[in-house]
Amino acid sequence: KCAASSSDSVPVKVEQRLREKAQAGKAYCDKNGYNTNYCFLVDFSIHSGKRRFFVWDFKGDSVKYASLCAHGYGKNSTVSKPVFSNVEGSYCSSLGKYKVGIRSYSKWGINIHYKLHGLEATNDNAFKRYIVLHSYTPLPETEVYPLHLPLGISQGCPVISDEVMRKVDGLLKAE
């Protein structure tokens, strides 16, 4: 099963790293007036065949859901080594903090996506680049390690499983 119901299914070292990122994220959200119920964390240092998209529950101080997550295929990215860029047309993923925007129709996955607004110099072109959070039906629900996710699933968007996207959509609609 792809979705983690608790932090038990996340390796301890990964959870510690996520907790540190989540604490910094919560401080940023508090300071800037953003929602402090949940945050989404993507750790592209994790092998693409393992879960690397996480929904962090601030109240429970733990991972609520986890999914595989595709990275962009542009600028000579490989299945094992993503290349990051904020340039329009690069088809690369971008690092940094994002604000989740409006829910919209998507032709991929469960047919919805959320607009992403980059909040840092490394991703401030995200909205112009049409970077959105969406799912893709062929993306596996379970880890495929030691295999990698194939390139071509993402043109820079964080792409997650349909199952976790349904759960993320439920959380966001409830906010």
Model feature map: region roles:
Residues 2-155, 162-175:
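Cell wall/extracellular polymer interaction/catalysis modules
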